[in-house]
């Protein structure tokens, strides 16, 4: 009897503790749409840059969300399929017409529209980016601001590429 009363009190205490803790853990959820300046409501990709800003890729361009309003960026293609944020403040953005490099701090873009339909790519910094295009592996040459095929690499059977923290391409 004493044990069942004690168990009942413990359950009651646990219920009160949960009810008090849940509001403390809740976060504000708000709906963000074209009213806040987004170019399109269909968001296909999201990334957070090194400064904490959120970048959203939509069916009509790249959008920078500052917490209150969205700013739009036009790239090599309107359909932004993937965004990779690097630790040094850059974004590599895959569109339907190529892979573009965006300086997140200066808010400028370097367009590379000559590589449509890139499906796999990886990046680690503003100067390190690789992607597969038509069975070949391409690397970014920072000194010339362009991509070139890597010699001796046949990528027909490669399904995924990635860079490890040491800069080794897998």
Per-region residue spans from a language model:
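Carboxylate-rich, polar loop motifs that coordinate divalent cations or form catalytic acidic clusters
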Residues: 1-170
């Amino acid at each position: 009897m004493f044990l069942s009363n004690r168990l009942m009190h413990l359950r009651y205490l646990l219920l009160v503790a949960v009810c008090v803790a849940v509001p403390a853990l809740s976060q504000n959820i708000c709906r963000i749409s074209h009213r806040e300046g987004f170019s399109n409501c269909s968001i296909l990709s999201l990334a957070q840059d090194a400064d904490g800003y959120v970048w959203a890729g939509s069916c009509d361009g790249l959008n920078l969300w500052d917490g209150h309003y969205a700013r739009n960026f036009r790239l090599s293609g309107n359909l932004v399929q993937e965004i990779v944020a690097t630790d040094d403040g850059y974004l590599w953005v895959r569109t339907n017409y190529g892979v573009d490099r965006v300086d997140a701090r200066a808010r400028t873009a370097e367009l590379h529209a000559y590589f449509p339909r890139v499906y796999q790519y990886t990046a680690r910094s503003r100067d390190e980016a690789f992607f597969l295009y038509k069975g070949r592996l391409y690397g970014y040459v920072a000194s010339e601001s362009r991509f070139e095929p890597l010699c001796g690499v046949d990528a027909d059977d490669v399904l995924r590429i990635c860079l490890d923290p040491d800069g080794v391409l897998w």
